[in-house]
């Protein structure tokens, strides 16, 4: 490894030779980042991306002004899926260094897991990786159950089984119980439900190549809620939380589900499949039924669910949906504290009725008459949350993954949302 390039911070503008808008300058001692007080964390992240683009793979964050948030902003921009990078961190107090180390361990796990090729990360591997991460931070305070294949059908998990049966890799439900109280009768404070589609071809409603080439990332919701629980534990979470990951491939085969199929769920709802590429909501429904059965104060589901959310928000914000205004406000406050981007989109009672079917209670996708795709998807999920008007948040993870690099991010997963959900759990 080469000698480290020193990176320092300054509140003074760059020398005029670098231009009036320069955010960094190069000198004999290394590189100086010039903070202007407007968006210092964003400036640091963008500068780190540029430094990586120069081919500098070994840096030392040096001098005054560095704290955990600024170090983390640098790493968010500096990290990329290819190559090895080394950062020598500045001296931080014990609490800040622990916070930074926990972010590096857990949020990097989220990014690396989402970036993993689908060939090496199937449903079973995703579930086991989640167990390993949570067990690493929680020890014996965790128990779990993995249900897969035909056992899912026999136990009534018909959405997950239906979507996943077309793959040679069995669908999997992970039910994990973090119980720091040690009391088996302790109430469940929160349930987290994640969409874990480890590859999404679209099924018989097959995607075009341009929309399929990033579908290894369709398990981003599952990775995000797993990381959020792990991170909340490192921040002292002392309440019982259950995690449900609904993991499957959505592939084409002679055994794959078809348009016109009808799925009957354990809560009695019948759903007609009119688009096999709207599979995420079908698997999440099973997890939400289980979550509701725990009678928690809070249910949060996270999923890379709709293209409509990305159309509205790009990859810059996660989309938030809820009937509970106070709870949505708490989540947005947590996002502001953690400097993570969330934006609330509409969800009203009428969205629940915009999925009509001639053969079942619900259709799994909206029609031309009801084009608000992200809102109708959230409305669909609400049919599987027992008390959907209170205590439920749906996150459509539009900021989880970038197909191409931008000025502040490399291509690939971002890890955004982990800290916000953890903040809400520990508030």
Curated annotation (Swiss-Prot):
Belongs to the peptidase M17 family. NCBIfam families: PRK05015.1. Probably plays an important role in intracellular peptide degradation. Keywords: Aminopeptidase, Cytoplasm, Hydrolase, Manganese, Metal-binding, Protease. Its cofactor is Mn(2+). The keyword Coiled coil does not apply. Binds 2 manganese ions per subunit. Homohexamer. The active site is at 207, 281. It catalyses: Release of an N-terminal amino acid, Xaa, from a peptide or arylamide. Xaa is preferably Glu or Asp but may be other amino acids, including Leu, Met, His, Cys and Gln. It comes from the Bacteria. GO terms for molecular function: manganese ion binding; metalloaminopeptidase activity. It is found in: Cytoplasm. GO terms for biological process: proteolysis. Gene3D superfamilies: Zn peptidases (3.40.630.10). Mn(2+) 2 binds at residues 195, 200, 218, 279. InterPro entries: Leucine_aapep/pepB, M17_PepB-like_N, Pept_M17_PepB, Peptidase_M17_C. This is Peptidase B.
